Swiss-Prot record:
The keyword Cell cycle applies. Belongs to the MinE family. The gene is minE. Prevents the cell division inhibition by proteins MinC and MinD at internal division sites while permitting inhibition at polar sites. This ensures cell division at the proper site by restricting the formation of a division septum at the midpoint of the long axis of the cell. Keywords: Cell cycle, Cell division. This is Cell division topological specificity factor. One of its GO terms (biological process) is cell division. It comes from Edwardsiella ictaluri (strain 93-146). The keyword Cell cycle applies. It holds the Pfam family MinE.
Length: 89
C-alpha cells in the first residue's frame, strides 16, 4: 500500500507549506509568551534576599516556571552556594 500511496499522493502547494511553517512559528511564540511578566522582578527580589545572608554571584541563581497541566505551575529555584562561607557586606 505504501507504493500506491506514493503514486497517489498530492504534492504540497507552497500555500500549504507556508501555512504549516506559520503554525509552527505561532506555536513556538505562544510557548515563549507563557512566561509571566513578573518573573524577572521575582528573580531580582529573590536574589536580593539571598544576598542578605550569603554572598553569591547573580549568575549562580536560576529561576524557571514550568506549566504542569492547565492549572498547575511549578516555580523552580536553583542556587549554587559558594563552598567557603563569607559574610555579606
Amino acid at each position: 500500500m505504501a507504493l500506491l500511496d506514493f503514486f497517489l499522493s498530492r504534492k504540497k502547494t507552497t500555500a500549504n507549506i507556508a501555512k504549516e511553517r506559520l503554525q509552527i512559528i505561532v506555536a513556538e511564540r505562544r510557548r515563549g509568551d507563557s512566561e509571566p511578566h513578573y518573573l524577572p522582578q521575582l528573580k531580582r527580589d529573590l536574589l536580593a534576599v539571598i544576598c542578605k545572608y550569603v554572598q553569591i554571584d547573580p549568575e549562580m541563581v536560576s529561576v524557571q516556571l514550568e506549566q504542569k497541566g492547565d492549572d498547575i505551575s511549578v516555580l523552580e529555584l536553583n542556587v549554587t552556594l559558594p563552598e567557603n562561607e563569607e559574610a555579606p557586606k
